[in-house]
Curated annotation (Swiss-Prot):
This is Transmembrane protein 26. PANTHER family: TMEM26 PROTEIN, TRANSMEMBRANE PROTEIN 26. Its main location: membrane. It comes from Mus musculus. The gene is Tmem26. Residues 354-366 have a biased composition (Polar residues).
């Protein structure tokens, strides 16, 4: 079992490393400058994190945070920023046609030479691999960038699934977290694709940078597990300390989910879309639809917040704080009269005195 944990930890981090290297390779290909290979040095952080995790945690994760996912985002974010800031949309159709022509021409050549290389299996494999790499390099830039965005989100979900469970998270909580990640990834992907594909946006580097800042900010929720690990059972001592403590203790996970929607995802996304529509006059039916969707989600979260506040208020009203008993000091012994005995134990029966004669006290002997 320990070996399986170590294997899953290594395989997941290797997947992160390979994907970030592919992104760096694409940046160097687009920019045509080898100095961008220096971005690969960021992967040393992932190597360091792997060594520390294997040494101190035996491959298992941490509580409330996944350092591997955080370092992976640090590695790949600069490459995606450079690709998004590089303007190459106008060459997409030309490059796609050229790639299709080269692919068909190369396929005809391979069919002609296949009969002459029937016995050389390794040569065919190398030729196919070389042709595959050449075809990938000819794919137009927007398609490459979109593919990197899509694979990034898929690898985040699969990687979080494969990473060994650590801390206090359970399998049930992990499955709930992964389902949340799927919905979050879909929202983030449509935000980047729908906003950055507009020509009015692409021609404004400041606006592109602002959208990428919001996108980067929204990606920071993936390394956190607070939405499922903050489901606590409040002890009795907390329930006697006031409304705010009870509210924060009972609904900490719900409050974290509401905060994510307001300040990390739906709130910033709505602000960006409103700025595009009102200030920059970028209006289309998809942008309007997703703006309404973000508004509706935030309204529902606000409705839930009000419902949680009312539920806590009803709980405090039904469970009032009981008065604390007064403890007497060591030098002041407590004294109580008969009236206090009757109040303390109403079901107790009072003792009645009955006269006992001397004859009834002791049995007589014959």
């Amino acid at each position: 079992m320990e070996g399986l944990v170590l294997l899953k930890a290594l395989v997941t981090r290797l997947l992160f490393l390979l994907h970030s290297l592919v992104a760096v390779w694409r940046v160097t290909w687009v920019k045509e400058e080898h100095r961008y290979w220096l971005l690969a040095l960021l992967n040393l952080l992932l190597v360091l994190e792997t060594v520390l995790t294997l040494k101190f945690k035996r491959g298992r994760g941490y509580k409330w945070l996944s350092p591997a996912i955080f370092v992976y985002l640090v590695n790949i974010m600069p490459s995606l920023w450079l690709l998004e800031m590089h303007h190459g949309n106008q060459y997409c159709s030309t490059q796609s046609e050229r790639m299709a022509q080269n692919f068909s021409r190369r396929g005809d050549v391979n069919q002609t030479l296949s009969s002459h290389r029937a016995t050389n299996g390794m040569g065919n494999i190398l030729e196919l691999a070389r042709g595959f790499v050449d075809n990938l390099s000819m794919v137009c830039e927007p398609v490459w960038t979109l593919g990197l965005h899509q694979t990034l989100l898929l690898i985040l979900i699969i990687g979080r699934w494969l990473l060994p469970i650590g801390g206090t998270i359970t399998r049930d909580q992990l499955s709930e977290l992964l389902l949340m990640f799927v919905g979050t990834a879909a929202d983030i992907l449509e935000f980047t694709t729908e906003t950055l594909k507009e020509n009015n946006v692409r021609t404004n580097p400041t606006l592109v940078s602002g959208i990428l800042v919001v996108w980067t900010w929204s990606m920071l929720q993936f390394p956190l597990d607070l939405a499922v690990q903050l489901k606590l059972v409040c002890p009795a001592s907390v329930k006697a300390r006031g409304f705010l403590r009870v509210f924060l203790c009972q609904y900490s996970a719900d409050l974290w989910a509401i905060g994510l929607s307001f300040f990390i995802q739906d709130g910033p996304f709505l602000v960006v879309r409103l700025v595009l529509m009102i200030y920059f006059k970028v209006i289309n039916h998809m942008l309007v639809f997703f703006a309404v969707k973000n508004s509706l989600v935030m309204a529902l979260h606000f409705y839930r917040l009000v419902a949680l506040i009312m539920a806590t208020r009803d709980f405090m009203r039904d469970h009032p704080e009981s008065p604390k008993p007064e403890h007497s000091g060591p030098d002041q012994p407590s004294e109580s009269g008969p009236s206090e005995w009757e109040d303390a134990s109403p079901e107790a029966l009072p003792l009645r005195t009955s006269p006992v004669t001397s004859e009834e006290s002791y049995p007589t002997t014959p």
